[in-house]
Amino acid sequence: MDKKELFDALDDFSQQLLVTLADVEAIKKNLKSLVEENTALRLENSKLRERLGEVEADAPVKAKHVRESVRRIYRDGFHVCNDFYGQRREQDEECMFCDELLYRE
């Protein structure tokens, strides 16, 4: 291999290294962007989980209160089922639709 071929090979290798370096820099920039997005999403996820915990803690209390209100309306002699809601139950007779609603899990 003469000096010119050696110089050309070294020059080609140098050019390939520059292209590879540019690719690595682009990958680093993309990775930095992804890490920042990931950090933001983790923070948002953490806040949402915290908020969900607060909402779930309040939910059983509200559900119990609503269920008690519906039972009280039924005991007062009114239908709570979808078919006859708000109508007075004649002689406080049982309604299977209301019972299903009141005692479902």
Curated annotation (Swiss-Prot):
Cofactors, names only: Zn(2+)
One Pfam family here: YabA
Keywords: Cytoplasm, DNA replication, DNA replication inhibitor, Metal-binding, Zinc
Entry's transmembrane regions: none
Location of the protein in the cell: Cytoplasm, Nucleoid
Keyword check for Aminoacyl-tRNA synthetase: no
Family, as annotated: Belongs to the YabA family.
Name this protein carries in UniProt: Replication initiation control protein YabA
Gene name tied to this protein: yabA
